[in-house]
Amino acid sequence: MLNIFKPAPHIERLDDSKMDAAYKRLRLQVFIGIFIGYAGYYLLRKNFAFAIPYLQEQGFSKTELGLVLAAVSIAYGFSKFIMGMVSDRCNPRYFLATGLFLSAIVNILFVSMPWVTSSVTIMFIFMFINGWFQGMGWPPCGRTMAHWFSISERGTKMSIWNVAHNIGGGILAPLVTLGIAMFVTWKSVFFFPAIIAIIISFLIVLLVRDTPQSCGLPPIEEYRNDYPKHAFKNQEKELTTKEILFQYVLNNKFLWYIAFANVFVYFVRYGVVDWAPTYLTEAKGFSPEDSRWSYFLYEYAGIPGTILCGWISDRFFKSRRAPAGVLFMAGVFIAVLVYWLNPAGNPLVDNIALISIGFLIYGPVMLIGLQAIDLAPKKAAGTAAGLTGFFGYIGGSAFANAIMGFVVDRFNWNGGFIMLISSCILAIVFLALTWNTGKRAEHV
């Protein structure tokens, strides 16, 4: 491992007179760093979808391009788990920045060499590599949150950070439009967001810090006098990969429950959003332009919903994440039913249902990652979150992309929505199995 990636060493503590001001300043600085950084990752995760119409003009089919699109999700799922283990033994300041920088380079190379976009196989390989580097984003952010924010405030703070998903994903469409207008080529779908991402990668290095102790500050639990009821022993000790995997992650049944819950939450998330333009135009009579606006509203509805969900889990459920997740998934169940059963010709109801799904679904998405952090020691936070992410993207996102299309082709939209409704129910069941975990949970 290169020295630059090693966890930053602890240094001598600051004087008590300087500690409070330094802690407040650095917490805000680090939070801004991982917020901007993760939003930057999203600029390079969904941009391929905007290139599909242009690549179709070159003779590629939807099936071929859908396979390339799935490469990102497949690679991301594996990478989030594997790179999560690596990130637990790395300095997130450089790990997060490196992943974004390398993802940007892949995007630039994708359109810099004409032979890349001449073959589905080569495009798949490049997007797989891009997805792998994308997996270096969430785990170091999760590790950073675990070190700089204590458990009783983490739900609210994490929900605010999670809005970076929506900011990065939502701003991509206008950035793509601007890039095409400026450079007069569809290839700007890749290189224009990549240039911005490279700039962001340097901002990450400027803003993010590893642990409070590496800045001369006490652990966050000591600073806020906010200790988990059943804290892990020696949680500031660096752990080996074997200890992380076999002592704290793979043998924790609650992590497995939320990993399975994540499969069904992600299936609903991507089964709705990735197919919304097609469903609205084919089944509900929307124009393509109107369906894009509906997509935009779906994404940005997730911002207040995510923040509210995190706040509820802290304020009303005392840092237990499952009750809030169950509550929001029950709401998703109702909204998906309305979205499905509302007759064509009622666009207002369709949009309200879609906005409601967006408002509600991102809360459970955020809470599962947060709950994984809560259920593991701080030094195993990246691996724990990586396990749930692996299940979400391999079992949920990639499955939604591939299976939804297959089912709709053979059983029409009713078949697809039966799968979405079933996924809502199964997500609720698996979340309910972790009802009392979180602040009150004991390690199993």
Curated annotation (Swiss-Prot):
Where does the sequence pass through the membrane? 37-57, 64-84, 94-112, 121-141, 161-180, 190-207, 262-282, 288-308, 322-341, 347-368, 388-409, 415-435
Topology within the bilayer: Multi-pass membrane protein
Q: Which residue ranges are assigned to the Extracellular compartment in the record's topology?
A: 58-63, 113-120, 181-189, 283-287, 342-346, 410-414
Q: Which residues lie on this side of the membrane: Cytoplasmic?
A: 1-36, 85-93, 142-160, 208-261, 309-321, 369-387, 436-444
Q: Which UniProt keywords apply?
A: Cell membrane, Glycerol metabolism, Membrane, Transmembrane, Transmembrane helix, Transport
Q: Which molecular-function annotations from GO does this UniProt entry contain?
A: glucose 6-phosphate:phosphate antiporter activity; glycerol-3-phosphate transmembrane transporter activity
- Tell me where it resides: Cell membrane
GO biological process assignments = glucose-6-phosphate transport; glycerol metabolic process; phosphate ion transmembrane transport
Which GO cellular component does the record give, naming just one? plasma membrane
Entry-linked CDD domains: MFS_GlpT (cd17345)
**Which InterPro entries does the record match to this protein?**
G3P_transporter, MFS, MFS_dom, MFS_trans_sf, OPA_Antiporter, Sugar-P_transporter_CS, Sugar_P_transporter
In the record, the note on similarity to other proteins reads: Belongs to the major facilitator superfamily. Organophosphate:Pi antiporter (OPA) (TC 2.A.1.4) family.
Q: What does this protein do, in the record's words? A: Responsible for glycerol-3-phosphate uptake.
Q: Which PANTHER family match?
A: GLUCOSE-6-PHOSPHATE EXCHANGER SLC37A4, GLYCEROL-3-PHOSPHATE TRANSPORTER
Q: What is this protein called?
A: Glycerol-3-phosphate transporter
Organism per entry: Bacillus subtilis (strain 168)
